[in-house]
Amino acid sequence: QPPIEKDVNDKAEATLEARDEEFTYHVKTKIPYEATAFNITDTLKDVLDFSGEKGQAEATVDGKKLSDDHIAINGQTITVTLNQEELKANADKEIKLTFKAKIREGANLSDYIEKGKTVINNQASYNAAFPNDPNFHKDSNIVPVTPPNPENPPIEKKVNEAESANLGARDEEFTYTIDTTVPLDVTGFAVYDTIEKVLEFSGENGQASATVDGQPLDASHITIKGQKITVKLTEDEAKALGGKAVHVSFKAKIKAGANLSDYIEKDGTTRIYNTAKYNFNNDPGTEQSSKPVPVIPPTPTEPELKKEVNGKEAET
């Protein structure tokens, strides 16, 4: 029986320049002799979508376009079907299906990563009925599509909604915020921040809160251990929320009695820096860091040195 061939963008495989790039599949074979029933089917992976109405699909026999009612899309499967009369009239003629697809927006491709490369394979097939074989099935070659690897999103930390904070008083409470995005195609994600030893979380659990895509996360996602605060998503959440904005907020202050001499810089100013970080897939090698954010407490006043003699400034 005739082979069935599939290509993408007229090639055996396609490397996309952009994740949202549209690509074109072609499937072709010949109509078998003596077939009493025949269809071509192609089921897209669940991370793909047909692009445009009915995938902008078109089918031809011997170069002549078939009417659209020959083509049906049900979920992820596109099917081209010929009736018995068409089969008899067109035996051994080429039938070709063309349609367009793209990667589904927000799709998590972690299941398609092999050795650091993302590959989405697809395969077409045809089904035919013959007098001696009513359930004949034949598969095409496998056609891979490779999207570009997603870039790591930036992470930004602020204090009191600014890049630095000058405190009015040494014991003043201040608010750290962290903003980033859940990376695409990950199976785990955590944002964390280890505050300097001279700082402490202010209030119960640092009055911490976190949102993803503007929706609050419950407290079980936030943990504080020693000087470190962590906001962590489950595997299902990380997969479902790729590309969504993450916002973390917590409060801190300088510890009472803390010695800040290690934080005095050459210009005489005391600056306490802190950096937020994230990693994904529980892999420390994926860690990304924000710019350091300084908190600047007021310079302590020198204590007055006063000397007296017999309770007086002078004695004669």
What is each stretch, according to the model?
Residues Q1-N9, L109-E114, T118-N160, L260-E265, ...:
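Extracellular/luminal low-complexity Ser/Thr/Pro-rich, glycosylation-prone repeat/linker regions
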Residues P3, A35-N39, Q56-E58, P154, ...:
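Exposed beta-strand and adjacent loop surfaces of beta-rich binding modules
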Residues K6, V27, I40, F99, ...:
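Extracellular/surface recognition and adhesion modules
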Residues T29-Y33, L44-D46, G63, A101-A107, ...:
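Beta-strand elements of well-folded, non-transmembrane domains
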Residues N39-L82, A190-L233:
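A surface/secretory-pathway sequence property marking extracellular, secreted
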